[in-house]
């Protein structure tokens, strides 16, 4: 059984609230879980103390048992100092113009100068 520490969505429509749970990786996102070990309320300001709540001893217990945290939860655990922060992945620059578009723009600029 592969265990994951992940977010389970709760709360009303347009008002997200998440429980941080330990669950079998095959179970649905909001389905059966083994233990609830914290909460995450994204509606609160980033510096609010109740935005992320973790039961630290249970988090360390499940990590020692081999549970893998998802990317978002791994960042929460890293900020709490219970595990090392995950490596930061660079976001690709998707909106940068491609090579041919840059060449065409350069040609238009030359034509406009002449």
Curated annotation (Swiss-Prot):
Keywords annotated in UniProt: Ribonucleoprotein, Ribosomal protein
Family matches, as PROSITE patterns: RIBOSOMAL_S16
GO biological process: translation
Pfam families in UniProt: Ribosomal_S16
Protein's UniProt keywords contain Nucleus: no
Annotated Basic and acidic residues bias: 100-114
Region (Disordered) residue spans: 87-114
Molecular-function annotations in GO: structural constituent of ribosome
Key word Mitochondrion present: no
One annotated Gene Ontology cellular component of this protein: small ribosomal subunit
Family to which this protein belongs: Belongs to the bacterial ribosomal protein bS16 family.
Entry protein name: Small ribosomal subunit protein bS16
Source species of the chain: Acidiphilium cryptum (strain JF-5)
